[in-house]
Amino acid sequence: MKLLLISKLARSSRAINTITQYSRVAGELGHKIAVFGEKQLDFPELQFSLDVPAFDIAIFIIYMPSDFPDLPYLASLLDGMPKSRRVIIDCSGRYNETIRVEHDFNHLEKMDGHQGWEWIEAFQSVADRILQPTLTPRRDDVGSFLFHGYDPEGVVHPVASAAEATQHWSRSKKYGVAYVGNNWQRWTQVQRFLEAIGPIHQKLGPIALVGWDWKRRPDWAVQMGIKGADVDPEFLQQLDVETGDAIPFTELPGFLSNARFCPIFQRPLFNELGLVTNRLFETFIADTIPLVMVPEPLAESIYGPAVRPLLPTNDIGSWLQDIIRNPEPYWEAILRVRQHLTLHHSYHQRLTELIAMLGA
């Protein structure tokens, strides 16, 4: 099958790693994947095409309005591919009634100028099939497709046993804790986590936050009165937290492997809707201990029951100290989760699921 993917590309955000992985495995499975548009030199890993009729299905990967192409490219897509062969993967839960969780919304009218009904009508006008990366869509006219996946070949330091993993992990690392992700609807969770580890942060080692807008609250958020990009620079300074700009997706596994621990946070909205992101899968290929800071039902639905030791306890500081004292059982959990991800969530498995779904 020939699939044409439509989305705005960025090397440090959104679905770039997922799109690249689909492109990699497509040829191995006898399929063809290209990204709609003219060749972009920043993305040598990808094939591009404007020849819409040459493809069987057009798949729109949507986070925000800019993921839809501008005219005349959008017109070319709509004219060149029948609506029955156009699919939307709604990565942010836009195709729902308006939902608010803490400061997080699925319809950010102040930012993108579109109300909830506009999103719903736009999706319905573009495609006959709408998918969301959740096991529990809220609308009857939405299909479940997790989209993101796990790359077992990308594991930074493959090991044969938990004992071997423990020995390698116990060597000196640059960071005690590192989190890679942009400061958008995550500060509440990050702040609680840092407050919990504050008393032992010197024992853990340096802490790093990497992504957009961790140094200070951005001017646009202040001007628009939007709470989702809050941050407390003085608090970060008290813990000697190192902040850095977003990094390309190709550098992510190596960077995370420089840390003992890497928490996995998601937007409150995503936790509420059960939406998954690529970070839930990518973190498990790094040479680090993932701290799975998402709701237990969501975690077990993706990782299986083996993930339980990697879920937070009520006393996060004591939990991390126990891992440091006796890391081998936790590495045993990581290896079992990796096996589960390889079996159920590899990109080969994911693309096979998608092809079967589209061919139905």
Language model regions located:
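A general structural motif
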Residues: 1, 30, 54-57, 83-84, ...
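Short amphipathic alpha-helix with an adjacent loop that forms part of the alpha/beta core around
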Residues: 45-53, 322-323
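Short acidic/histidine-rich motifs immediately flanking catalytic phosphotransfer sites
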Residues: 50-59, 259-260
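Glycosyltransferases and closely related glycan-assembly transferases
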Residues: 53-54, 69-86, 98-101
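Conserved acidic donor-binding segment of nucleotide-sugar-dependent glycosyltransferases
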Residues: 306-314, 322-327
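Short amphipathic alpha-helices within nucleic acid-binding modules
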Residues: 319
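A charged, aromatic-enriched C-terminal amphipathic alpha-helix characteristic of glycosyltransferases
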Residues: 324-358
